[in-house]
């Protein structure tokens, strides 16, 4: 504690200024500058000082505010019922103190509904006569931002309820670990800055002025609060069950628990499970289950008295940087990676951490031999948070960023205002290798047996220089590869030959054009039907397709204007590679799945999720990630959870994996 009032005043001023700056970066710019636990420690210190020196309390203090200011670029929304923040604690002892306060106020023990604390962005959904009227962020708690146009592109948000009710529900908008990793990879390869964690990726994606951007970002929601629920709903647990029946996406891991011992067991359970969940959680939330008791307990100016968040302690380890490796991606972006002494962190052994670009490397001032603090950003990505300067070797020297490509030796450049460092040599062996590996990948041409090691050998032995060369390989060529015998040779040649029959969207995606992902390739192929028309399409024609923006359109037109691209397409066509769209007009003739919206859930025994999705899409189905009234069919495997229950509640047709395969085989038999 500060020794005098004057010292306390000075520390409070410093803390408020620092916390205001950090909160602005976190809530308003979606670009955090410190880890959550650092913010929490400073915030707790400010609370401690304000409690000790009542004369230092101020209505302007961040401890008396909710969230951040409202983004002036988005329409403002006034919340009829304020969207409050939550108090938080960091130990089981503090949870016990919360429970004692509740019992003292109520006069007897209470049951709690315990929920996972999803690391996302607070969201309000208002319905009028059963139709979505407005969606808004929390903002400062009193006034939020109108994000209705963007929320319409979040698949698990119902646009219409099965009952014509006027109501409001609230929850969390989040980005799954898979979607986050994919988004950051795409941004990294494009030379764009990456998001620090899934929470900020979700916030930045939801608060877009262009809804098309939101649509591409694969956001999800968990709904957990019903404002003024209908008569007969008496508890938080019951409210969540009833909201699920209305079609809202709720979290299946919530439980009604009668005592703190069970709550502690729940915390221990999900402390162990958190790494295996498909989304990020940063704690658990304890809520008095009885809604009448919630009303009796009421709120402070900032937080409800009937709920509290228990936040997981940060996992951070120290290790030593031994090397900084530079790798070249298929688009030419050169990325530094710190190679470190292996250390156990958040459920896995970590020995490498991306430094992303030269700017970050310089900002952190990482040097060989440095001891660094390592954590997992969003519980997913190993990341260096800082250098432990007190342990820096005396003979340490600043790290020099290379000026030559580590693969081909050509000069490295910065394009326009990119932070990324690039090799722009189209013949760079590393780029060629990455490009061919991508072309052969399961998501693209799906050439079984043609992985990175085989591609590396093919290039090293001068057998291929681009993707078209694959279709001119012979058995004699492949016999030159190490450990490649007759069976392996025949299998690879068959796989290459089969890939000639793929639909053109897989070829387009396989070319690895900047910013053109699998979904974009499919939309473009569906519109133009063949590669010739795609290659000659104008920017205006491309952007007329829903969700295709200027970035994708310009990348495509620039690529197809290159002479090398024209020659490559000609050689692919000469090799018999299909250049036509085989979707709705071809393979997807009449069949059970054609035109249906299908959801997959549970563990599939015969195919990976991606393989099954491709099969259904080839039959003309639309595969989505969440169950709603618009879902035509649910295909489920083992351990199917909330999606199956929701489909049953909505009376949506359901097929086991075996039944779905039987339907697919019926289609194959008809061919």
From Swiss-Prot:
Cofactors required: Mg(2+); Mn(2+)
Residues annotated as catalytic: 117 (n6-amp-lysine intermediate)
Gene Ontology molecular function: DNA binding; DNA ligase (NAD+) activity; metal ion binding
Residue span(s) of domain BRCT: 588-671
Annotated NAD(+) binding sites: 36-40, 85-86, 115, 138, 172, 287, 311
Entry's family note: Belongs to the NAD-dependent DNA ligase family. LigA subfamily.
EC top class named in words: ligase
Protein name: DNA ligase
Entry EC no(s): 6.5.1.2
Cystine residue pairs: none
Protein function: DNA ligase that catalyzes the formation of phosphodiester linkages between 5'-phosphoryl and 3'-hydroxyl groups in double-stranded DNA using NAD as a coenzyme and as the energy source for the reaction. It is essential for DNA replication and repair of damaged DNA.
InterPro entries: BRCT_dom, BRCT_dom_sf, DisA/LigA_HHH, DNA_ligase, DNA_ligase_AS, DNA_ligase_CS, DNAligase_adenylation, DNAligase_N
Residues involved in Zn(2+) binding: 405, 408, 423, 428
Short name of one Pfam family: HHH_2
CC annotations in GO: cytosol
């Amino acid at each position: 504690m500060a020794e005098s009032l004057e010292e306390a005043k000075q520390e409070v001023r410093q803390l408020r200024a620092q916390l205001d700056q950090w909160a602005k970066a976190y809530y308003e710019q979606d670009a955090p500058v410190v880890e959550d636990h650092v913010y929490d420690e400073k915030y707790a210190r400010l609370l401690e000082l304000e409690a000790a020196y009542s004369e230092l309390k101020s209505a302007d203090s961040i401890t008396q505010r909710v969230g951040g200011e409202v983004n002036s670029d988005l329409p403002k929304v006034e919340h009829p019922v304020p969207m409050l923040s939550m108090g938080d604690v960091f130990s089981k002892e503090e949870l016990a103190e919360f429970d004692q306060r509740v019992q003292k106020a109520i006069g007897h023990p209470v049951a709690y509904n315990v929920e996972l604390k999803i690391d996302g962005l607070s969201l309000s959904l208002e319905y009028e006569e059963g139709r979505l009227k407005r969606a808004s962020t929390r903002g400062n708690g009193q006034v939020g931002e109108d994000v209705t146009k963007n929320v319409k592109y979040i698949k698990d948000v119902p646009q219409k309820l099965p009952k014509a009710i006027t109501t409001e529900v609230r929850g969390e908008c989040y980005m799954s670990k898979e979607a986050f990793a994919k988004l950051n990879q795409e941004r990294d390869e494009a030379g764009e800055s990456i998001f620090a964690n899934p929470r900020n990726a979700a916030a930045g994606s939801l608060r877009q002025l262009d809804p098309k951007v939101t649509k591409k970002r694969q956001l999800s929601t968990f709904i957990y609060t019903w404002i003024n629920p209908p008569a007969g709903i008496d508890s938080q647990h019951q409210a969540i069950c009833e909201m699920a029946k209305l079609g809202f996406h709720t979290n299946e891991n919530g439980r009604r628990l009668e005592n703190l011992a069970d709550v502690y067991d729940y915390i221990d359970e999900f402390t162990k499970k958190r790494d295996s969940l498909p989304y990020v959680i940063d704690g658990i939330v304890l809520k008095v289950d009885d809604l009448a008791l919630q009303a009796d307990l009421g709120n402070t100016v900032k937080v409800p008295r009937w709920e509290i968040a228990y936040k997981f302690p940060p996992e951070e380890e120290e290790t030593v940087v031994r090397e900084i490796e530079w790798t070249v991606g298929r688009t030419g972006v050169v990325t530094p990676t710190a190679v470190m002494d292996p250390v156990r962190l958040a459920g896995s052994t970590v020995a490498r951490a991306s430094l992303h670009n030269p700017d970050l490397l310089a900002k952190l001032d990482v040097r060989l031999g440095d001891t660094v603090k390592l954590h997992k950003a969003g519980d997913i990505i190993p990341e260096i948070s800082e250098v432990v300067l007190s342990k820096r070797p005396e003979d340490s020297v600043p790290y020099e960023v290379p000026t030559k490509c580590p693969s081909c030796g050509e000069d490295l450049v910065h394009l326009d205002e990119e932070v990324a460092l690039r090799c722009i040599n189209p013949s760079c062996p590393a780029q060629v290798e990455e490009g061919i590996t991508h072309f052969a990948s399961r998501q693209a041409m799906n050439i079984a047996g043609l992985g990175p090691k085989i591609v590396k050998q093919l290039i090293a032995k001068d057998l291929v220089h681009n993707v078209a060369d694959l279709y001119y390989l012979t058995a004699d060529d492949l016999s030159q590869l190490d450990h490649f015998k007759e069976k392996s040779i025949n299998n690879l040649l068959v796989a290459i030959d089969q890939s000639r029959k793929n639909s053109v969207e897989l070829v387009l995606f396989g070319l690895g054009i900047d910013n053109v992902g699998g979904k974009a390739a499919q939309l473009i192929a569906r519109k133009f039907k063949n590669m010739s028309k795609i290659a000659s399409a104008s920017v205006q024609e491309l952007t007329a397709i829903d969700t295709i923006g200027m970035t994708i359109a310009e990348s495509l037109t620039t690529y197809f204007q290159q002479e090398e691209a024209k020659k490559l397409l000609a050689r692919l066509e000469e090799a018999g590679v299909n250049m036509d769209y085989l979707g709705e007009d071809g393979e997807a003739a009449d069949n059970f799945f054609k035109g249906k919206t299908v959801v997959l859930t549970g563990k599939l025994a015969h195919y990976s999720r991606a393989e099954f999705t491709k099969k259904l899409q080839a039959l003309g189905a639309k595969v989505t990630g969440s169950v709603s009234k618009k879902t035509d069919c649910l295909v489920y495997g083992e351990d199917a959870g909330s999606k199956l229950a929701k489909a049953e509640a909505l009376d949506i047709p359901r097929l086991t994996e075996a039944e779905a395969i039987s339907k697919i085989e019926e289609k194959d038999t008809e061919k």
